[in-house]
Amino acid sequence: MTIESGRIRIFDTTLRDGEQSPGATMNLQEKIRLARQLETLGVDIMEAGFPASSQGDFEAVQAIARAVKGVEVAGLCRAMPADIDRAWEAVKVAENPRIHTFLATSPVHMQYKLRKEPDQVVEMAVAAVRHAAKYTSNVEFSAEDASRSNPDFLVRVFEAVINAGATTINVPDTVGYAQPEEFGRLIRYVIENTPNSHKAVFSVHCHNDLGMGVANTLAALKAGARQAEVTISGIGERAGNASLEEIVMALHTRRDFYQLDCGVVTEQLFPTCRLLSMIIGQPIPPNKAIVGANAFAHESGIHQDGMLKNRETYEIMTPESIGKTKTDLVIGKHSGRNAVKNKLDELGYRLEEAQLVTVFEAVKKLADKKKQIYDEDIEALVLEEVYRLPDLYRLVNLSVQCSDTGMPPTAAVVMDVMGEVKRAAGFGVGPIDAVFNVIGEIVGRAPVLERYSVTAITGGTDAQGEVTVRLRQNGSSAVGRGSDPDIILASARAYVNALNRLAKKEEEQEKEGI
């Protein structure tokens, strides 16, 4: 396939591989919101999910395929006719659909997982690609565990699947085993030795088990690969995937070395990472490359002196280049609905009239509690008010009493449980423990609290606190989040949100017969 020799295609798999990261599950509305942000970011392809895995995933992939424009939408599927059919049904509504089928090629996978001989694996791969090519000319084939596969066997498989109709060949480092120099050699070898390699785009998908995901991806691009499969903030299975923002900024900042470019709008990198962080309730680590809070912080006196004289002494890129600008005041107590609507449009939220009214009312309530409302506050409100699941449980009222007299903290809670108002009160070791105990008593659940974290959304003593909790019960886990200037109220909202997600997940599992 002919492409610009220096143009890298960015294939984002946050919605599929990224969502496999523990605690990163998203509901349908959150997936669509993130997909639209990926569209704004300028990725070439987004992998929307694995349609054959569940009815919920099928519906999400189909909804994303309908929602986004100007970007290819891929559905992942095993090298099986039923999987391929299901993937096509989900993505065919997209402007430019792609079927992404995969099959393992390493000796350990062929022997112990597939229980197939190499000749049989070649036949399966060819049959899968031919089946997919009946639907579309945009077919990607991945050789699972390629980095532990025999290079000559990879060449044999790749030649066969290209002849069968594959237009993208993906070489994954599935378990993060490869080293950069070694992986670069492998990519160069398969491109140079596959007779029809000029008819396909070669791609890489690197995991981060040894911390080499980004380094291996860059080595592969230098060696001739022209598609990088990545995720926002590097989230994904186990230790994660190669990070989109790190790959993009490495190419952007060191264009002199790589002589490569991509179509990503770098100014959208930080807003995209921030959005993902808020959706999945996982804060961006302060020392995270490119987008962490410390990425552009300079504490050393020598560094500060150099920065004051010339920013280039210690900055190889600017905060502005990734969209990390000074937080601007956007909404105040007396702001009107148009101001809120304009800010939502600017942030990339396309809301219906009823949703706009809901957010506007929430903004006004928040403005009564804190003096200044920032972009991050607005985004937190949208995620909480618009993109939440339909509530089985809803917090109506909360009252907490604490003292230093030795009396345990008490909580009184009023909740709407499936349309019925219920009240209860109780004690706890601390105020948050008391609140969680009473909520659990009201809804008749006693999940295990696996994680609790709180972060300030913005600065100032009146800042909203964003609380994230992870609950586990009956083998299922769910992450919930809530925000409010009152940390105890934010905690209660997060707990109820997680309970709703847990109930929804159990309902979906019952439908799937799991």
UniProtKB/Swiss-Prot annotation:
It catalyses: 3-methyl-2-oxobutanoate + acetyl-CoA + H2O = (2S)-2-isopropylmalate + CoA + H(+). Pathway: Amino-acid biosynthesis; L-leucine biosynthesis; L-leucine from 3-methyl-2-oxobutanoate: step 1/4. GO terms for biological process: L-leucine biosynthetic process. Residues 394-514 are annotated as: Regulatory domain. Its EC number is 2.3.3.13. Its cofactor is Mn(2+). Residues 8-270 form the Pyruvate carboxyltransferase domain. Mn(2+) binds at D17, H205, H207, N241. GO terms for molecular function: 2-isopropylmalate synthase activity; acetyl-CoA C-acetyltransferase activity; manganese ion binding. Pfam families: HCS_D2, HMGL-like, LeuA_dimer. Belongs to the alpha-IPM synthase/homocitrate synthase family. LeuA type 1 subfamily. HAMAP family: LeuA_type1. Catalyzes the condensation of the acetyl group of acetyl-CoA with 3-methyl-2-oxobutanoate (2-ketoisovalerate) to form 3-carboxy-3-hydroxy-4-methylpentanoate (2-isopropylmalate). Homodimer. This is 2-isopropylmalate synthase. It comes from Nitratidesulfovibrio vulgaris (strain DSM 19637 / Miyazaki F). The gene is leuA.
